[in-house]
Amino acid sequence: MANKLRNYTINFGPQHPAAHGVLRMILELEGETIVRADPHIGLLHRGTEKLAETKTYLQALPYMDRLDYVSMMVNEQAYCLAVEKLAGIDVPIRAQYIRVMFAEVTRILNHLMGIGSHAFDIGAMTAILYAFRDREELMDLYEAVSGARMHAAYFRPGGVYRDLPDFMPKYESSKFRNAKVLKQLNESREGTMLDFIDAFCERFPKNIDTLETLLTDNRIWKQRTVGIGVVSPERAMQKGFTGVMLRGSGVEWDVRKTQPYEVYDKMDFDIPVGVNGDCYDRYLCRMEEMRQSVRIIKQCSEWLRVNPGPVITTNHKFAPPKRTEMKTGMEDLIHHFKLFTEGMHVPEGETYTAVEHPKGEFGVYIISDGANKPYRLKIRAPGFAHLQGMDEMAKGHMLADVVAIIGTQDIVFGEVDR
């Protein structure tokens, strides 16, 4: 009697530590080789798009932070640009520079998390410890401007919530830190926020070199990433891949260069592009992107030092007046009250606005019927398209390679499931 071969089906996730959230996949295996990978989405569905349609334009803003909760401010940026486009709001140039600077800070935050956790999933534990050391300082920047380390709600339609602070908060003594450690931690916090940013930009490239020393020529890292999850340029475009997933395959497409927004057309930076379209090339792209982000942050910091000015529109139909004015002027108080109760009214129309998110093209499509709430809000999340490529990328690889492919896609389920 002829032996019958039967494939083996297993559940991967949704509680798997390498699933980057609540990813559940049905994997069909032949021995240890993957025949089919079927991702199941929707476990983190919170109805963000529908919720935003029940809130005013300003109240809907914090929902954006909670989509991709590793790249918070870039989500806000896409939403604010869409509202500004519909309402015809002119954003002060200083606010645009601050936004671009914090968008690049967010890109570094995202890539440090992506590379660190990718290496950790594969088995290299040290990288994530180095990555989180640098992330801590960038989180302090978030906290200094907005009061929150993650969900900042710092970008607002018309500009940003407040100007950059004149000083950086310092660490205080505690039973966990002796005087020597405390002095080291507060060394770069003596001046303004821009001084802190400049000091970070000076030492961070060396920290990227340290990460590269751990991974780039590491034999085990290369064995686990070279030739894994290969996507051709044609298939990457057909699948709707964007960001590093597209550039890693050799397609030079970056919204910051091809369709510049804010002040990116005034910035001098390069777009790293891969050759082989595998996990290793995408890793190299992310490493180089962090270096390019440092270049952009330096240019923004240089400009912001010598160009003071307003950081939010003076049109009080869309942005609140200053607190000092509100306490003395009746009209200002009325504007403030109307904005935070009824909200802004955005003219009828529709717009699709996209930004170069650390994970790819993040787009916001808004239809306005002239009311104080969006009639329809659609979010184009880059991770959603990337996850749909899982079956094609994993087919023919070993079970252990699925973890490497999830890491290289850099998926966060807040934005995939929405």
Swiss-Prot record:
It holds the Pfam family Complex1_49kDa. Its main location: membrane. GO terms for cellular component: plasma membrane. It is a peripheral membrane protein. PROSITE patterns: COMPLEX1_49K (PS00535). SUPFAM superfamilies: HydB/Nqo4-like. Its EC number is 7.1.1.-. It comes from the Bacteria. It catalyses: a quinone + NADH + 5 H(+)(in) = a quinol + NAD(+) + 4 H(+)(out). InterPro entries: NADH_Q_OxRdtase_suD (IPR001135), NADH_UbQ_OxRdtase_49kDa_CS (IPR014029), NDH1_su_D/H (IPR022885), NiFe-Hase_large (IPR029014). Keywords: Cell inner membrane, Cell membrane, Membrane, NAD, Quinone, Translocase, Transport, Ubiquinone. One of its GO terms (molecular function) is NADH:ubiquinone reductase (non-electrogenic) activity. It is found in: Cell inner membrane. NDH-1 shuttles electrons from NADH, via FMN and iron-sulfur (Fe-S) centers, to quinones in the respiratory chain. The immediate electron acceptor for the enzyme in this species is believed to be ubiquinone. Couples the redox reaction to proton translocation (for every two electrons transferred, four hydrogen ions are translocated across the cytoplasmic membrane), and thus conserves the redox energy in a proton gradient. NCBIfam families: NuoD, PRK06075.1. Belongs to the complex I 49 kDa subunit family. NDH-1 is composed of 14 different subunits. Subunits NuoB, C, D, E, F, and G constitute the peripheral sector of the complex. This is NADH-quinone oxidoreductase subunit D. It comes from Neisseria meningitidis serogroup C / serotype 2a (strain ATCC 700532 / DSM 15464 / FAM18). The lineage of its organism: Bacteria, Pseudomonadati, Pseudomonadota, Betaproteobacteria, Neisseriales.
